[in-house]
Amino acid sequence: MNEFWLQINIIVPAAGIDLVCHEMTELGSAGITVEERALDTFVVPDPDADIPETLILKVYFPPEIEPEQLARQVAERLAWLAPLIPGLEVVTPEISRVRAEDWAENWKQHFGIQRIGSRLVIRPTWEAFSPDPQDAVLTLDPGMAFGTGSHATTRLCLEALAELYETPPGPQRVLDVGTGSGILAVAAALLGAGQVLGCDIDETACQVALDNARQNGVIEQIAVTLDPLETLGGDFDVVLANILAEENARLAPELVHRLAPGGVLILSGILNEKEQLVIDAFAGRGLTGPDIRRQDEWSCLCYIKEA
């Protein structure tokens, strides 16, 4: 393990966390933590202003990356994202060096064991845990480029997914669209899915998903692909899409086409105010629903394909 890591702090509106995390992963980030931003007591807020909640991303990169080049690349990615994330400030970030053990300890302060539903457990490697016989335990490590399951969009998906496996064996064929680090795909396999396919447009994300599947002992059940959604076969028992509302809406015909009759469609990454955009896009497509779950400013829509 590297003795030192490069750390960049980025202030991000809450609604843009997933997009910024994705771009940092593409740049080669080895880990990201999210912290609440303390308010500046010397600034009197305008009561009429619509100020989005902001969070601090602490992004860690391997020490062999050249710092000045990294700072420029991060600034370029933020400039590209600025039109998509209202309130995102485009600055050239300062880079600091932190000890590897300091990063790991920072991770440990923020994440503990999470139980999602009656069977799924997310366990950091440093936490001792005695699982029940029916538990599906997903193990995380601070050195893994892996979502923690604590972000609302991911947690809503995990909750909806876990409910499908309350009584084993549960759905067997699962498609995870925009798999990213693979946390949803790995969870599905651990819960009992026999065949899980993750697809993503990012080659790095696909490799990370495979690494995480291997780490959790489900590599035989999971495949990943860069192939476009429209080229994939259908008849999946579950289709997961934790992507932006606009992408869910745009991909509506293809997502529904991938579902087997009676299959479950779980859509997340949707801001509350964009629920209707997604609902309208999936109307009239032979679906029952949606069942809507909400956490903070995020929504998750669940449909069943009519037989």
Curated annotation (Swiss-Prot):
Disulfide bonds: none annotated. PANTHER family: ELECTRON TRANSFER FLAVOPROTEIN BETA SUBUNIT LYSINE METHYLTRANSFERASE (PTHR43648:SF1). Pfam families: PrmA. It comes from Syntrophotalea carbinolica (strain DSM 2380 / NBRC 103641 / GraBd1) (Pelobacter carbinolicus). One of its GO terms (biological process) is methylation. Keywords: Cytoplasm, Methyltransferase, S-adenosyl-L-methionine, Transferase. One of its GO terms (molecular function) is protein-lysine N-methyltransferase activity. One of its GO terms (cellular component) is cytoplasm. It catalyses: L-lysyl-[protein] + 3 S-adenosyl-L-methionine = N(6),N(6),N(6)-trimethyl-L-lysyl-[protein] + 3 S-adenosyl-L-homocysteine + 3 H(+). It is found in: Cytoplasm. This is Ribosomal protein L11 methyltransferase. Belongs to the methyltransferase superfamily. PrmA family. Its EC number is 2.1.1.-. Methylates ribosomal protein L11. S-adenosyl-L-methionine binds at T154, G178, D200, N242. InterPro entries: Ribosomal_L11_MeTrfase_PrmA, Ribosomal_PrmA_MeTrfase, SAM-dependent_MTases_sf. It comes from the Bacteria. CDD domains: AdoMet_MTases. The keyword Methyltransferase applies. The keyword Cytoplasm applies. It is an enzyme of class 2 (transferase).
